[in-house]
Amino acid sequence: MRQTNVALLYEAQRERLALTHVSGQLDRTISVTEDRIWPADLIGHLNLIHPARLQILGAAELSWAQRQSREKIGHHLTEIINARPPAIIVADRCQPPPILCTICENADIALFTTPHPAASVIDQLRLYLSRELSEKISLHGVFMDVLGLGVFITGNSGAGKSELALELISRGHGLVADDIVEFSRIAPTVLEGRCPAMLKDFIEVRGLGILNIRTIFGETACRRKMRLRLVVHLERRLPGQTDPSRLPMHRETQEVLGVPVLRAILPVAAGRNIAVLLEAAVRSTILQLRGIDSTQEFIDRQQRMLEGEPGPD
């Protein structure tokens, strides 16, 4: 179960949202208990159908409440409080009604106020919870920023992943993480990779030991995070092993946390410049993401020439 708590949310967002703690305890848990629930579902405008959410009350909700009888408002607030929401936030520079302060105080539900608009508060907290409560996985490999694309380099031990990363860094690309990469699914089709705090800025290369990339190459050689767009697998061919297709009709993909990611296999052999090949794979992927497929262009040109049409000049 993925979870955080109100205290951590308050500390992380207190300055950004100018939150003021009015009453209640901060120890209540915010958690994702089912796979079908997204972290963004855990917060929203005042909602009696989903009372267990983190509830946001803006000017519109408070204006509606003022038009209702005290008994009706007391009944609805009791329904919400009985569902034990993590917290209630009053936005739009509004003052929380006395009845709300009393109920939250008695039930130990955290009550906050903020001068920011309710919609802005919801957007900011949804983004925060989506990252904090996202699905996560740690994978072995090297994560790089190559030409602005997040590239995850994989391969068996001794395949040359760290050496390749070092060469790419010397060519102006950036290191995100070496050895262990933490990937988070921050949106239905978006994977974000980061480096564990212990390994940040470091890379281990056989024969050289541990190197601090930020110290050696400067600030621009390291990245804090990147979106994963391509997996490059380094593979040493064994005698008799079948070579991959020289003209693949479809790009291979690899699933990470249920999200398909484009995958390229680069055979490793003496004399091959893997850094140049990886850069070419990245450039090809960028073109494909823009709808340009070089393989399909070649097939279409071949078909036109077979049909008697003139080729390009």
Curated annotation (Swiss-Prot):
It comes from Aromatoleum aromaticum (strain DSM 19018 / LMG 30748 / EbN1) (Azoarcus sp. (strain EbN1)). Residues 267-272 are annotated as: Important for the catalytic mechanism of dephosphorylation. Belongs to the HPrK/P family. Both phosphorylation and phosphorolysis are carried out by the same active site and suggest a common mechanism for both reactions. The gene is hprK. Mg(2+) binds at S162, E204. The Walker A ATP-binding motif also binds Pi and PPi. GO terms for molecular function: ATP binding; magnesium ion binding; phosphorelay sensor kinase activity; protein serine/threonine kinase activity; protein serine/threonine/tyrosine kinase activity. It holds the Pfam family Hpr_kinase_C. Homohexamer. HAMAP family: HPr_kinase. Keywords: ATP-binding, Kinase, Magnesium, Metal-binding, Multifunctional enzyme, Nucleotide-binding, Serine/threonine-protein kinase, Transferase. Catalyzes the ATP- as well as the pyrophosphate-dependent phosphorylation of a specific serine residue in HPr, a phosphocarrier protein of the phosphoenolpyruvate-dependent sugar phosphotransferase system (PTS). HprK/P also catalyzes the pyrophosphate-producing, inorganic phosphate-dependent dephosphorylation (phosphorolysis) of seryl-phosphorylated HPr (P-Ser-HPr). The active site is at H140, K161, D179 (proton acceptor), R246. Residues 203-212 are annotated as: Important for the catalytic mechanism of both phosphorylation and dephosphorylation. ATP binds at G155, N156, S157, G158, A159, G160, K161, S162. Its cofactor is Mg(2+). SUPFAM superfamilies: HprK N-terminal domain-like, PEP carboxykinase-like. This is HPr kinase/phosphorylase. It catalyses: [HPr protein]-L-serine + ATP = [HPr protein]-O-phospho-L-serine + ADP + H(+); [HPr protein]-O-phospho-L-serine + phosphate + H(+) = [HPr protein]-L-serine + diphosphate. GO terms for biological process: regulation of carbohydrate metabolic process. Its EC number is 2.7.11.-, 2.7.4.-.
